[in-house]
């Protein structure tokens, strides 16, 4: 029951920013909410995968991506999810949407969302992006308290899908 309460809390908090798929007649969702990002490619030239990668800069593992609907995020808060953590996730999604809007308004293809995730080596190394290191690594104040840096930067998902290497041990 608490998973349903948590999913509906998050869905209501994000309702002004994101459309939710599969809500009932009362506007409520089940134990999960599916956020519609289908228009992001057209509106911001940013896709669902870019947003999933940017979530890593905020310290979150991406939720289920493009299932059951292409270009969506399926968020399933657990029964024991603390409200403070849900609030951080909500603030993160809203901030990432703002970053998408800024990128579209500036017309800048080299932006903080499409280049995510940003590793510690990248933040500390030579910087060639038009946005600041601060924006890349610490976009919201709560991140300063316990920053987690991803170990790898953006990878070519399509290449990985087409060139699977299976290694079996004996």
Question: Locations of the language-model features?
Answer:
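Non-catalytic terminal extensions of PLP-dependent enzymes
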Residues: 1-170
